Design a protein with these regions (language model features):
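All-alpha prenyltransferase/terpene-synthase fold signal
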Residues: 1-219
Length: 219
């Protein structure tokens, strides 16, 4: 219950950061009640997730792992907005690991927080890192596929959010073209009247980036 509360708090805050109006087909908290309420709700859910652990004596030893996960998640989310250039594949993997792995690994790693330096723990950590990247790649492919179905640029491209397919496409661009993916100083999306958006969406669809990403997921 504690981890699920933390997970949902991260989704509420994520929608605020990304200006998303819906979550899983349902109007997001920030869209329905405003950004301020959404931030406060997310904060309250994080506090409640810690409170649940502190009230159960059998789980109090997991509080350190729980709080470390919160710190890592916050740093990972902030890292997404701290660069003006679109992430390379290596940077993409690092971003995903920072904002996804701590949450996915928490239920198991929190069971034995004193044994994090063992060989077995490192193997478990690598497993969760790989799982996090695979999970995010699935979401990214779905985002591109949704754009194709709607015959419109995918939201991840429009908002210049890290996406596995776009990162692979970006890696293959000449340095001069990569500059066209440079974000504004606010780290935000393409302007609504920016003609590059449709152009680059067409180029992504014409490339083999989506096929390469699907193969990566299969591997």
């Amino acid at each position: 219950a504690s981890v699920e509360l933390l997970h949902n708090a991260s989704l509420v805050h994520d929608d605020v950061c990304d200006d998303d109006s819906d979550r899983r087909g349902i109007t997001s908290v920030s869209e329905m009640y405003g950004r301020e309420i959404a931030i406060c709700l997310g904060d309250a859910m994080i506090a409640l997730s810690s409170l649940l652990l502190s009230q159960d004596t059998a789980l109090q030893h997991t509080l350190t792992a729980h709080n470390l996960a919160i710190l890592k998640l916050s740093a990972g989310q902030a890292a997404e907005f701290s660069t003006l250039s679109y992430p390379t594949w290596a940077a993409y993997e690092k971003l995903v690991e920072g904002k996804t792995t701590p949450l996915i690994s928490l239920p198991l790693l929190g069971l034995n927080p004193s044994d994090q330096d063992s060989a077995e723990s490192h193997q478990v950590a690598q497993y969760f890192s790989d799982t996090s990247i695979a999970f995010q790649i699935m979401n990214d492919i779905q985002n591109i596929d949704q754009g194709k179905q709607l015959a419109a640029p995918a939201s991840d491209l429009r908002e210049l959010r890290p996406n596995a397919v776009i990162a692979i496409f970006y890696e293959g661009l000449p340095d001069l073209d990569k500059r066209l993916f440079t974000r504004s100083k606010s780290g935000k999306k393409f302007a609504e009247n920016d003609t590059r958006l449709n152009f680059w969406w067409e180029q992504i669809l014409l490339s083999d980036s989506l096929a390469i990403t699907r193969r990566l997921l299969g591997d």
